């Protein structure tokens, strides 16, 4: 299920499939909600409202996402945490490293690993040069930061 789209604004080249909170997908939302609750309580202490949006991103060769933040106006203003789960083993693709601005080395997490960070942290995905890289990306929502 889900809606599939292709976006390329010179900043991003990824396939995107939105995952709706239907009965067949609820187990994903429930698992992520449990993880987000524990991590938020331990590390961030952000006010969350239980709402979550979820996409699968596909990066094929030449796929990338340049420097950006996940926070913005309108519907993007209530994002409180970005949650990225690696669906592809790192040996299945080349390139596609996750980088954070001024935060050290490029990240190449293992399949099944999840990275959680505030949506105001600038980050990017380097171009994939071989294979395909799939990630499950979620945003936990709450009152907009002030």
Predicted features and spans:
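Conserved short histidine dyad/triad with adjacent acidic residue
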Residues: 56-75
């Amino acid at each position: 299920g889900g809606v599939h789209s292709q976006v390329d604004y010179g900043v991003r080249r990824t396939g995107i499939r939105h995952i709706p909170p239907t009965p067949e997908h609820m187990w994903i939302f429930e698992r992520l909600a449990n993880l987000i609750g524990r991590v938020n309580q331990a590390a961030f202490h952000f006010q969350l409202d239980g709402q979550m949006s979820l996409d699968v991103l596909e990066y094929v060769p030449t796929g990338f996402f340049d420097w950006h933040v996940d926070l913005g106006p309108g519907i993007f203003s209530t994002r409180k945490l970005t949650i990225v789960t690696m669906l592809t083993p790192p040996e299945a693709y080349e390139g596609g490293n996750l980088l954070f601005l001024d935060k050290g080395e490029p990240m190449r997490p293992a399949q099944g690993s999840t990275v959680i960070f505030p949506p105001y942290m600038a980050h990017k995905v380097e171009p994939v040069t071989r294979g395909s890289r799939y990630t499950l990306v979620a945003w936990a929502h709450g009152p907009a930061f002030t």
